[in-house]
Amino acid sequence: MRSKFKDEHPFEKRKAEAERIRQKYNDRIPVICEKVEKSDIATIDKKKYLVPSDLTVGQFVYVIRKRIKLSPEKAIFIFVDEVLPPTAALMSSIYEEHKDEDGFLYISYSGENTFGEALEEAN
């Protein structure tokens, strides 16, 4: 998925910002969270997050759900490099494995499992 944040900000500026953030807040992870383009889920009000390194993926999903005011019965999927990360994984380990060369971790979210195999509905 192409990041709008990357399109709007040149690489050197993004890299410098991520480095500044990591120096100032070494226990935090700079995350860019964007909606998957064709998803019908609500658009998030802010893209940039400073996430505690000991936060789990599940806790981060909870933060996103709150920001987009998603009702409990609605599904949300988050993707890192077009893969669903494990809910119990720490954001710090996801960051170390998947951070971009600019120093940010890019996460996309959707109301559908757009990159994995299709989920079948039970009748």
Swiss-Prot record:
One of its GO terms (biological process) is autophagy. It comes from the Eukaryota. The C-terminal 7 residues are removed by atg4 to expose Gly-116 at the C-terminus. The c-terminal Gly is then amidated with phosphatidylethanolamine by an activating system similar to that for ubiquitin. The record marks 116-117 as: Cleavage. It is found in: Cytoplasmic vesicle, Autophagosome membrane; Vacuole membrane. Residues 117-123 form a propeptide. A lipid is attached at residue 116 (Phosphatidylethanolamine amidated glycine). Keywords: Autophagy, Cytoplasmic vesicle, Lipoprotein, Membrane, Protein transport, Transport, Ubl conjugation pathway, Vacuole. It is a lipid-anchor. InterPro entries: Atg8-like, Ubiquitin-like_domsf. Signal peptide: none annotated. One of its GO terms (cellular component) is autophagosome membrane. It holds the Pfam family ATG8. Ubiquitin-like modifier involved in autophagosome formation. With atg4, mediates the delivery of the autophagosomes to the vacuole via the microtubule cytoskeleton. Required for selective autophagic degradation of the nucleus (nucleophagy) as well as for mitophagy which contributes to regulate mitochondrial quantity and quality by eliminating the mitochondria to a basal level to fulfill cellular energy requirements and preventing excess ROS production. Participates also in membrane fusion events that take place in the early secretory pathway. Belongs to the ATG8 family. This is Autophagy-related protein 8. The gene is atg8.
